Amino acid sequence: VLVTIAYAIAGTMFGESVSNVMSYVLIMTLFGLSFNLQFGYAGMTSLGHAMYFGTGGYVLVALCQKAHMNVWLACLLTLVICFVFYTLCGIVCLKNNMMTFTFLSMGISLSVSVAVSKWMFMGGTVGLNCKVAPAWMNDYKVLYLFILAVVVVCTILIYMLSKSPFVMLLKGGRENEERLVFLGVNTHTLHTVVFVISGMFAAVAGMLFAFRNNGAYVASLDSGLSFEAIIMCVVGGASSFFGPVLGGLIVALVYNFLPQVTEYYQGFLGFFVLLIVYFMREGLLSPLSLIHI
């Protein structure tokens, strides 16, 4: 509650520029939490998580701009379309083992990114520029509070899910999948379900990004965004629920402020990740984060 109040004050009391940065931090936090459902709890390393983020925004903007649909109806239909698409992707990606899953997820993500960038109906390399937020969100403070509210609700839902028997099964499969199979658990279904749930939360983050940026753009499908999700979890700690929250905060601030200082900001981020992986292998917030030499 105190953190939510602090975010609300910081995003509404210090001007529009601060609000823009804080809204970006919130969206990246949700994106990182969604990825950690796969990466941290199930041990599934997806290299295509940007696809969920990007498709959420693109489908929403396309429905509003091309079909002239009411924004809230478009949001609902976007979730339905994403659910069907992610289910099909999950069935394909999880057909074999986790090694093939990693590369299949990357392949599908790259295919979607290239297809969207070449498809003029989706704006090509320019993207779709459309104000999807309703008129009552014209005030940046109202838009920020809306984004904050959605992220808080999603965070609570993910936290509740992380404490459920379902996630305990995911952790069991991560540690010893053969034992779960021996006990009669269908691990393929288990992994497909968490794949879809993770994608849905990432799609919500992408939809919020479309609200914030008044459109959907090819950068939201870029493979670099998938690696950012991994960095968030590695830096903060994939075994801690709030690890991706801290990781998302760090990554978002780096990408917002370091480019103003140096053009080599990605190198600094890479060096920081290297130090974390070498000295604190479980991340900054993990209870198992010990100094290793």
Language-model segments: residues:
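Cytosolic-side transmembrane-helix boundaries in multi-pass membrane proteins
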Residues: V1-I5, E175, F182-T189, L258-I293
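Residue-level recognition of pore/gate-forming positions within transmembrane alpha-helices
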Residues: M28, G57-Y58, C82-F83, M106-S111, ...
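Alpha-helical transmembrane segments within multi-pass membrane transporters and channels
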Residues: A67-L110, L246-G248
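Transmembrane alpha-helical segments in multi-pass inner-membrane proteins
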Residues: L76, T192-L274, Y278-F279
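Helix-loop-helix "hairpin" substructures at the membrane interface of multi-pass membrane proteins
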Residues: N138-Y217
